Amino acid sequence: MNNIKSFFGKKKKTQDQAEPLVIGDDSEKRTVILPPPSPNAVKRKNKNEKPYSIDLNGVGEVGGKVYNNVVGVFADGNDTGEISPTIYCVSDFQGLLKNDRKWIQYSELPEGYTVFYFQTILCVLNFLRRREFVHYIYVDKFEQILEMNENNENIITTVIPTNPIDENDKINSKSINDGDDNGGGSGGGGDNSPLTNVILPTITTTDTTTTSITISPPPKNHLSLLEEDIKNNQNLHHKQQQLQQLQQLKQQHLQQQQKLKQEQQQEQQQQQEDEPNKSPVSTSSTLSPQLESTNFEMTNDDTSLNAPNAMLTPNNISGISYSIIYPGKKKRIDFSRIFVSPGHSFRFPEEYDKALEKHLNEGNPKEHFKNLDFEARGGFGSVFCAKNKNPHSAYDKQMVALKKMPIKTLRHKRMNLSEIGFLKYFNHPNIVKFLCAYQKSNDELWMIMEFLSGGTLKNAASNFKFCERKIAYVCREILQGLDYLHKQNIAHRDLKSANVMVNDKGEIKLIDFGLCIDFSIEKEEINMLGSPSYISPEMINGNPHSLSTDIWSFGICALEMLLGKLPYHDSRLKAMVFVATNNLNLPLLLSTTTSSLEFRDFLTNCLQFDPSKRLTSSQLLQHPFLTKACPIKDFKEILPALYMSNTLSNMF
């Protein structure tokens, strides 16, 4: 029994799950921007709370003043439960928080990655650290700000020398949690915070619609530092090669900046034509092209230092600073829609009541269903095994899966009601069957689905060695479900082995449609979402994604069945950076296997870096590899052992 416990118990922490490290005093390498406060102040319930906390209720306190840091998506001021992150403006590896520097070192990225792919690493860190409300912004050379003034007569950037700090204005601040998302702990800390002294200037303006903060000049950019290292190199032969490579990088960097500048000019020209009375000024030329969507804007108002959350850091106590407006979170293209059918939806929040009437059943669900056992917890609710106790219903004494879905925020209301809409519309043997849905209370929905005994594909892949015939069977069944979605311009966007169920009949079914999206109107979107190891390269790089993003995730699932584990499973950060930089290295991963040429070709067509080169679900269903699929009776041989392993893992 002890051996069984050790096998199914908690696994040893990997590099991504190391204990949080104490933050060192390296704040001079970055600039810190605290989240903008809401005008609605909220008092602390716990007097022992830390001076700055962003725990359960999204309430942050600075210097004895408590602010509600919840940011609303809609203009009417309703909040969505989203908490603004703390922004760190950095220009090189040394500007990262100590936790993140150590994380990157533990990931053992190849030499030079932190220089050549630094902006990609920032995008990955922002995604993995989103639950700790940490967000990095790449800022290039400060000279670019002055260059913008010379090249754009309409842009007036305020350059303000900051005043010396009076001792009476200093406020000591405790450290802000700095752990790694899911895999690096949630604590951090001590008093060695990157923000050691916070200044709250006096509020002298009545306009609180925009929030301004101050940022100090960043250090030299990565190309300048690289050039210094090359010049100090004593090896003349390698120095010449490195200088040539550096020159190519500079040309690429210049081309990117010129292209970005042209796009901005075209966008500004279009905005002026559409809204002649508005002239927003963007400073994204000082930021990474991949982070262009953060929509920073320059301000020429000297009162920006008197804004509610204007903060000064130890790095800009004296010298030159400039002000920007705090960035807003990028919205999903379907943020104002609740799905009904492809191309049709309810407007949210205006038609929320109509959506409730359309998607939900009347009555109290507790009169019909009884909770039995907890099964799983996901990003959009908790799933329980339940039993129908109404003898006159269509599901008499039937075991069902009951998903409890919170609707406390606008985001929860839209996403969870949309998931109900998607499942209610779907009708396919490879997709979990929707039964009914109820509103349990003002804070919770109950969705009833068919109960799938057995386990997930993740359980199966980690406990059994799949032969190619069984892999082909699973791949064919998943693709049939995907093909049904894609033919209706619907993408799953969270396809992973944990969202593929195997029931006691050997049937394969897709579950969890919380991130599902209808591409009938817009054909693509720019957003990063899903599970780290399964996210496509176009998502990580901030490029438009569409239906083909599911094909990449499907290819990772197939590779996981072959290897028995995810590629680069020891580090999510490393896996995502490799995917984003076209360095998955499929031939190397397959070199340790005895896979056939057909299977290798099948995987290669799924895991193409360029999404336009990936085969579609319909094309993959015609691939010769799938002709190897075993009959369902042969696949059912693994079910008893799979069911037992799933039961034991739930026990311990």
Swiss-Prot record:
Catalytic activities: L-seryl-[protein] + ATP = O-phospho-L-seryl-[protein] + ADP + H(+); L-threonyl-[protein] + ATP = O-phospho-L-threonyl-[protein] + ADP + H(+)
One Gene Ontology molecular-function label: metal ion binding
Keywords: ATP-binding, Coiled coil, Kinase, Magnesium, Metal-binding, Nucleotide-binding, Serine/threonine-protein kinase, Transferase
Record region (Disordered): 1-47, 163-198, 257-289
SUPFAM superfamilies (UniProt xref): Protein kinase-like (PK-like)
Cofactor entry: Mg(2+)
Pfam families in alphabetical order: Pkinase
Gene3D superfamilies per UniProt: Phosphorylase Kinase, domain 1, Transferase(Phosphotransferase) domain 1
SMART domains listed in its UniProt record: S_TKc
UniProt domain Protein kinase: residue ranges: 369-626
Biased composition regions of type Polar residues, renumbered to the chain: 279-289
Ranges of biased composition (kind: Gly residues): 182-191
InterPro entries: Kinase-like_dom_sf, PAK3-like, Prot_kinase_dom, Ser/Thr_kinase_AS
Active site: D494 (proton acceptor)
Family as reported in the entry's similarity comment: Belongs to the protein kinase superfamily. STE Ser/Thr protein kinase family. STE20 subfamily.
Protein name: Probable serine/threonine-protein kinase mkcD
Originating organism: Dictyostelium discoideum (Social amoeba)
Gene: mkcD
